[in-house]
């Protein structure tokens, strides 16, 4: 999941992660919105949630998925609400850290500060998912 305003950094991380996951028996889930999520769809998400009520969709995704991976998100990003749903259900939230000067890194850096698991190397995440 991630920002609707995807950076080149976010695009690269998503591409690298999707490439690592393509031969694993892991279902990739996303929400149909622009930005990072549309890149996940383009690269092969297996399940796509849709609708206009993002609070309801976020709850459905949190019920369905085992973990949440957030690549980017700005201040006030909907990914913060989604992360809250996962945390409320006792599920792990993984975040890609970013530069503190980048608005698109605010949500991930803040969530890491609040206890989300930082993704320092993508290969380590794929080990956790097996």
Where does each model-flagged region fall?
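Glycine-biased, small-residue-rich flexible motifs in mid-sequence functional cores and linkers
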Residues: 1-130
């Amino acid at each position: 999941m991630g920002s609707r305003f995807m950076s080149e950094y976010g695009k690269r991380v998503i591409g690298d992660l999707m490439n690592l996951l393509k031969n694993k028996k892991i279902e990739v889930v996303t929400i149909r919105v622009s930005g990072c999520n549309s890149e996940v769809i383009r690269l092969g998400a297996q399940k796509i949630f849709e609708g206009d009520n993002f609070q309801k969709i976020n709850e459905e995704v949190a019920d369905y998925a085992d973990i949440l991976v957030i690549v980017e998100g700005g201040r006030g990003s909907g990914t913060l609400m989604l992360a809250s749903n996962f945390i409320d259900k006792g599920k792990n939230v993984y975040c890609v850290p970013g530069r503190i000067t980048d608005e698109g890194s605010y949500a991930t850096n803040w969530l890491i500060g609040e206890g989300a698991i930082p993704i320092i190397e993508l290969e380590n995440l794929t080990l956790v998912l097996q």
